[in-house]
Design a protein with these regions (language model features):
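Hydrophobic/small/kink-forming positions within alpha-helical transmembrane segments
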Residues: 17-25, 54, 79-87, 109-114, ...
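Transmembrane alpha-helical segments that form core, pore/gating elements
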Residues: 21, 25, 53, 149-210, ...
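C-terminal transmembrane-helix exit sites in multi-pass transporters
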Residues: 89-91, 108-133, 256-275
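Transmembrane alpha-helices of multi-pass small-molecule transport proteins
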Residues: 34-84, 169-174, 193-208
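Juxtamembrane helix-loop boundary signature in multi-pass membrane transporters
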Residues: 1-14, 113-165, 169, 282-310
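Helix-helix packing/entry segments at the starts of transmembrane helices
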Residues: 44, 102-107, 181-197, 232-264
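Cytoplasmic-side transmembrane-helix entry/capping segments in multi-pass membrane proteins
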Residues: 9-15, 69-79, 124-137, 157-160, ...
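Loop-to-transmembrane-helix transition segments
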Residues: 9-16, 63-88, 158-167, 212-230
Length: 310
C-alpha cells in the first residue's frame, strides 16, 4: 500500500465526488433536453467507462490480473442490482431536482446498516440504529412535499420520490454484494465487471425505445461514461492514500455541488425542507462512519468499488 497521505486522499475523494456530480448533471441534461431514457443513459455511462478503466489498469501493469475473477456469479448479481439502482437514479434525475435526488441518495449508506444486519448477520446496536432512524427521518422530510395526497399533488414528482428511494435501496443492496465480493476479488475486477454487466443490461433496453441523439446529446452521453470511469479511478485512488473513515465523509461535498449546479445550470433553487432533511441525513451518515471507525470495521475496499449511482 502507498505511503499514507491523508491530504492527497481527501483531495482525490473530493475530485471523484466533483466528477461524479458533473457526470450526473450531464445525465440529467440529456433527460431534460432530449428525453433520453434511463436504459440508454446506463448503456452510454457504462460502455464509455470501460476504455478508461482498461487504460488505467494497463498503465498500472495490472491488465492481466486485474480482471481475473473467481466469483463470476457474484459479479452478475452485483451487476444486475447495481444496474437497476443506476437506472432508477438516472430516472429520478428526470423527475426531481438535482439537490432532491442527491439528498435522497444519501439514504443508501443508512440502508446498508439495516441490510448488513439482515443479510450478513452483522451486529448492529443502538447507536447505529439510532443514527439510521435520524437519517431516515431526514429522508422523509426531503420526500414530504412529493408524497402529499392532495388533489393538486404532482404525480410525476410523487413517482420521482418513489423512484429515487428505490434507487437508494438498490444502491444499498449493491453495497452488500460488494462487501461480499471484496473478500475474494480485486477492486479492479469488481469495477470492470460491473461496467461490463451494466453495458449489456443497458443495451437490452434498446427494444423498449431509445432516442436518436443529436450531436450535443451524444457528446453528453459519451462524456458521462468517460467521466464516470475517471471518477471511479479517482475514488479508488483516494482510499489507497487515506483511511476510509477519514475520506468517506467528504462524499457529502456532493450536496454543495448539487445545489450549485441545480441553481446555475437547471434553475432549481433548493427548498428549505430539502436543506433541513439533507442536514439530518448527512449528520447521521457521518456519525455512522465515525462509529464504524470506533468499532474497527474496515470499509475501504467496499467503498473503492462503489459509485454514487449504484
Amino acid at each position: 500500500m502507498p505511503h499514507q497521505n491523508p491530504m492527497q486522499g481527501i483531495l482525490l475523494k473530493c475530485a471523484s465526488v466533483a466528477v461524479f456530480t458533473v457526470m450526473a448533471a450531464m445525465i440529467k441534461s440529456t433527460s431534460e433536453t432530449a428525453a433520453v431514457p434511463a436504459g440508454q443513459q446506463v448503456f452510454f455511462r457504462s460502455l464509455f467507462a470501460i476504455p478508461v478503466i482498461l487504460i488505467w489498469l494497463a498503465l498500472r501493469g495490472e491488465l492481466g490480473v486485474g480482471l481475473r475473477t473467481v466469483r463470476p456469479m457474484g459479479h452478475v448479481y452485483r451487476g444486475v442490482v447495481g444496474t437497476v439502482a443506476m437506472a432508477l437514479n438516472f430516472w429520478a434525475l428526470a423527475l426531481l431536482s438535482f439537490p432532491e435526488v442527491t439528498a435522497i441518495g444519501y439514504a443508501a449508506p443508512l440502508l446498508v446498516v439495516i441490510f448488513a444486519a439482515m443479510f450478513l448477520g452483522e451486529d448492529v446496536r443502538l447507536f447505529r440504529l439510532s443514527m439510521v432512524g435520524i437519517g431516515l427521518t431526514g429522508v422523509l422530510i426531503v420526500l414530504s412535499p412529493q408524497l402529499r395526497l392532495e388533489s393538486d399533488a404532482d404525480p410525476y414528482r410523487m413517482l420521482g420520490a418513489v423512484v429515487a428511494m428505490g434507487g437508494a435501496a438498490g444502491s444499498a443492496l449493491a453495497q452488500i454484494f460488494v462487501r461480499k465480493l471484496v473478500q475474494e476479488e480485486r477492486t479492479s475486477a469488481i469495477v470492470f465487471w460491473f461496467s461490463f454487466t451494466s453495458t449489456i443490461l443497458g443495451l437490452a433496453t434498446l427494444p423498449f425505445g431509445w432516442v436518436w441523439p443529436d450531436a450535443t446529446t451524444a457528446m453528453l452521453l459519451v462524456g458521462s461514461g468517460i467521466l464516470g470511469g475517471m471518477a471511479q479511478i479517482l475514488l479508488t485512488s483516494a482510499y489507497r492514500f487515506a483511511d476510509a473513515s477519514l475520506v468517506a465523509p467528504f462524499e457529502y461535498v456532493s450536496m454543495l455541488l448539487a445545489i450549485a449546479i441545480g441553481w446555475y445550470v437547471f434553475g432549481e433553487a433548493p427548498a428549505r425542507v430539502v436543506l433541513i432533511g439533507a442536514s439530518l441525513v448527512i449528520l447521521a451518515g457521518i456519525m455512522i462512519i465515525w462509529r464504524e471507525r470506533q468499532l474497527g470495521l474496515e470499509r475501504s475496499r467496499q467503498r473503492k468499488a462503489m459509485t454514487l449511482q449504484g
